[in-house]
């Protein structure tokens, strides 16, 4: 495929007018047209890399923790239709028995239709009982090296991220023991600044949905957010314009830098569906507009009802984030954070030919996956 007359998002994080060439599913620097080859005229549209979502739970009435091929394929199809072409869905806090079924289903899945399943984000159960958010406290478990390794074996190595509250018993030891096997993220935590620093020094590199389910910043108790800033951690942001005020989103890009921010959807099964009653991690959730809350605790946000592409779009159009920065945070950064950036996350030569064409208002005009138009 050749995509002509596009404003291409380059590896230098700028836009340049030009053409994209895709051969055998991957981007090449240049190629002569072949007989019968599909040529897509972008007509001046933006050409963005296919997005990479490393933290979402569900969409279209399905949840990754359903533990079925039907659920995984539904998520893969929906995400691809929204320009998200690599997915690393997140588990919820469940028992090892339930998580076994999730890992088995993921290991059995074969890519080829819809977004590629490139990993698993193990958000629970190694989190704080005081910051469970919408996680089910019944299934909380101390950080357990053996449990992680058993699940990783069942997942055939697909677990890319494990979330840990570092102040909990055994957590720092877990980080030291496992940081060479999987990326460790600080999450759902009451940790102090000092303990967070110790966690990063032990091998953690990542912060799950920054600002949410963690202590804030004060001048005498800087907390985990300042620890993450000082240690150069990668930080996730949910930019659905519900979880975080736009000023805090801009603040994060300016302080951490757009090379350290990762946009995530953190979406639950209602994403793509009308308002109504749904569930997340076995708990009832009420969805109205972009807001999802626990039905029995209306003040507790229960994930989002917004896909990653729309989160990126809102970051630009509603929150004042430069387009170049938002695209980087939704494609290259998440790909790098889980080690798949040789294949996904940019329009560099050698990467998969995953391309979104979008107009000036960031409405999707086309989605190309590995050189084949799917939208």
Task: Name each model-derived stretch.
Residues 57, 73-102, 115-128, 155-167, ...:
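Divalent metal-dependent hydrolysis catalytic cores, especially in the metallo-beta-lactamase
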Residues 44, 55, 122, 178, ...:
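Conserved, mostly hydrophobic/aromatic
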Residues 153-274:
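Active-site core of metal-dependent hydrolases
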Residues 45-67, 355:
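Di-metal (Zn2+ and/or Mg2+/Mn2+) metal-binding site signature of metallo-dependent hydrolases
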Residues 6, 336, 346-375:
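C-terminal cap of metal-dependent C-N hydrolases
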Residues 77-88, 128-156, 198-210, 221-234, ...:
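Active-site gating loops and adjacent loop-to-helix segments of metal-dependent hydrolytic enzymes
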